[in-house]
Amino acid sequence: MTMTAFSPEVVAQIARHMNDDHADDNVLIVRGLAGISTASAARMSGMDADGMDFEATVNDILVPVRIPFSARLTERRQVRTEAVRMYQEACAALGLEPTH
């Protein structure tokens, strides 16, 4: 069982940012790190101290996806570092150059 270091309000703020500003990155993360190459969309649906949760659209079906963090997070500022790491690793796995 995982523990959360983040309040529901903080999780909602992070999810809103990821979904509004990084929707394409969410898809790359799911494709590259979860190995779901047919994902056509993905939205962050939650997170805790150990990982980020997404709902991926695969063949018009919503599929839950969990991407673990590299280590347990204890502070909000660590989330950005992990999200960037996930994006960069996903790009590498897919043979793409990161655009940011």
Task: Give the location of each predicted region.
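Binding-site signature for planar aromatic cofactors or substrates
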Residues: 1-100
